Amino acid sequence: MELSVSLYRYNPEQDKFPYMKNYKVKKPEKDIMVLDLLNMLKEDDATISYRRSCREGVCGSDGMNINGKNGLACITPLSEVLKGNKLELRPLPGLPVIRDLIVDMTQFYEQYEKIKPFLQSDSEPPEQERLQSPQDRDKLDGLYECILCACCSTSCPSFWWNPDKFVGPAALLQAYLSLIHI
């Protein structure tokens, strides 16, 4: 059985406009991650461009739009996103495309930096590290896991349409962490 993969292609040095290119690939016998499928496609077409690094969902570098939903290719099982035998891969929306699935993250990082995502204290720094109680650490569960992949922010139309005014969900999460003073 074959899979039909529709891949967003754009090389500004060659292409006037982006286009979707269709690839046929034999459906793997066992379930694989979307990143594994991209690597298989790249073996046949070395011009395909995308980011990848850790393959563990830790670095966030392989964020992309997978069948209409933003996610990390390295931890997204192919079986969970296939529509029949079809898969569509696009770059994260709302950010400029550098090439194929690679976006320019400058706007995302600039918005994130606006909220000053670092420890801010009115008191003098201690001679040693600042201590955090286990109870305060527990309050962070579900809040500190953000890996800055931009999947949430680039899913948000307000981030696309008002990049100069709205910092986006990732930056708002960091701002919240600063506000709760843990």
Task: Identify what each model region corresponds to.
Residues 21, 58-60, 85:
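A generic structural signal for short beta-strands and their flanking turns/coil linkers
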Residues 2-22:
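Eukaryote-biased recognition of intrinsically disordered, low-complexity regulatory segments
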Residues 22-32:
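Short, contiguous acidic and Ser/Thr-rich linear segments
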Residues 49-79, 143-161:
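Local cysteine-cluster metal-coordination motifs and their immediate loop/turn environment
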Residues 31-46, 85-180:
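Ferredoxin-type iron-sulfur electron-transfer modules in oxidoreductases and energy-metabolism complexes
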Residues 7, 66-68, 91:
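Flexible glycine-/small-residue-rich
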Residues 81-83:
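Extracellular/mature segments of secreted proteins
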Residues 11, 24, 48-50:
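Short secondary-structure capping/turn segments at boundaries of alpha-helices and beta-strands
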